[in-house]
UniProtKB/Swiss-Prot annotation:
Name of protein: tRNA-specific 2-thiouridylase MnmA
Catalysis: reaction(s): S-sulfanyl-L-cysteinyl-[protein] + uridine(34) in tRNA + AH2 + ATP = 2-thiouridine(34) in tRNA + L-cysteinyl-[protein] + A + AMP + diphosphate + H(+)
Source species: Mycoplasmopsis pulmonis (strain UAB CTIP)
Lineage, top ranks: Bacteria, Bacillati, Mycoplasmatota, Mycoplasmoidales, Metamycoplasmataceae
PANTHER family reported in the protein's UniProt record: MITOCHONDRIAL TRNA-SPECIFIC 2-THIOURIDYLASE 1, TRNA 5-METHYLAMINOMETHYL-2-THIOURIDYLATE -METHYLTRANSFERASE
InterPro entries recorded: MnmA-like, MnmA-like_C, MnmA-like_central, MnmA-like_central_sf, Rossmann-like_a/b/a_fold
TM ranges: none
Length: 371
């Protein structure tokens, strides 16, 4: 049997993953990770957790500790607050300030969970493997989709290196979410009925723009209808708006919904178009960088991609360039492919890796609208 350190988050998924590993006879060690401190990081605006006697992360640790005791495994905790700030959060803020929409979960997996946390588990505890409660499958350094397609998290793991995946176990990869809940309830685990977390845990129920205002000052400007060149509203900061966004525009009295098609940060303008004008949002190829390709054994005629989580697969052709850059073609077109987001590449069930979307195009024209 192996010595396995598992990331215990205080949620039902990692709880069941730890339980299953223990049932299999492994030596299991729970490790709780904290990446955020609201006071240290000046996270004040709209942060209701500051008024609570027990902050959400401490509640999660208590839940994880109760589960560890039930299962009969030790649990430890480790802080990566500075590392998260330096490697993930400053990157996140810089991307927003430059007009991109990054994915913090992918950055956290790349720099913290499967780097700092992974190395700590191996070096501190002498672990043979590191386990997580993700819905994905790692096998011989390769990454595959989780069996439960509605919960598959391979998209978020596209920047994890193959050398790391060789020592990673995802006990839930071959399971449906309903089965995970059933096991938790039958084992009477403390987290059996705990609600699934969504989004970035330390933001809580706040709007993401409210959270960002702690770190990126508001820069009010105008909202411009790209089809008429007329000002139709005002905004608090162009960098807060993402391609394809419909909610939060506060455009009253319009005949139909509008969506964001671009912005000009220098002129402090956000450009929108009516929902019926899909051409302003549709691209058919993209340029991406920072490619992490874990598997070179694939059928180039069978490639598909996801441009965001829980999106349907899109058939693509990929042109591999130098310096970890790629061009990806999808001739039928797709709406709201967003610069800054991750493109995940697949060959059937195998997730080959991913890259960060830099530019999007319709034929020869870059979709970067201005007036």
């Amino acid at each position: 049997m192996s010595k396995i350190v598992i990331g215990l988050s205080g949620g039902v998924d990692s709880s069941v993953a730890a339980y299953l590993l223990k049932q299999q006879g492994h030596e299991v060690i729970g490790l709780f990770m904290r990446n955020w401190d609201s006071l240290v990081n000046s996270d004040i605006l709209g942060n209701s957790s500051l008024n609570q006697s027990l902050c959400p992360q401490e509640q999660d640790f208590q839940d994880a500790s109760r589960v560890a005791k039930q299962i009969g495994i030790p649990i430890y905790r480790v802080d990566f607050i500075k590392e998260y700030w330096d490697s993930v959060f400053e990157n996140l803020i810089e991307q927003y300030q430059n007009g991109f929409t990054p994915n913090p979960d992918i950055l956290c997996n790349k720099y913290i969970k499967f780097d700092k946390f992974f190395n700590y588990a191996i070096e501190k505890f002498g672990a043979d493997y590191v386990a997580m409660g993700h819905y994905a499958i790692a096998k011989e350094g390769n990454l595959y989709r989780g069996i439960d397609q509605s919960k598959d998290q391979s998209y978020f793991l596209t920047q994890v290196r193959s050398q790391v995946l060789e020592k990673v176990i995802f006990p839930l990869g071959n399971m449906e979410k309903s089965e995970v809940r059933r096991i938790a309830q039958e084992a009477n685990l403390y987290t059996a009925n705990k609600k699934d977390s969504t989004g970035i845990c330390f933001i809580g129920e706040r709007k993401f723009t409210d959270f960002l205002q702690n770190y990126i000052p508001t820069q009010p400007g105008t909202i411009v209808d790209i089809t008429t060149k007329k000002i139709v509203g005002n905004h608090i900061g162009a960098m807060y708006y993402t391609l394809g966004q419909r909610k939060g525009l506060n455009l009253g009295g319009m005949k139909e919904p509008y969506f964001v098609v671009g912005h000009d940060l220098e002129k402090k303008q956000v450009f929108v178009a009516p929902a019926s004008e899909k051409k302003w949002l549709t691209s058919n190829w993209l340029f991406a960088q920072n490619l992490n390709l874990n598997n070179h054994d694939f059928n180039p005629e069978n490639l598909s991609a996801k441009f965001r989580y829980r999106q349907k697969d899109v058939r693509v052709k990929v042109e591999f360039l130098e310096n970890d850059q790629i061009k990806v073609y999808y001739p039928e077109g797709f709406e709201a492919v967003t610069p800054g987001q991750q493109i995940a590449l697949y060959d059937g069930q195998k997730c080959l890796g991913g890259a960060v979307i830099k530019n999007i195009y319709w034929n020869e024209n870059e979709l970067n609208y201005s007036v």
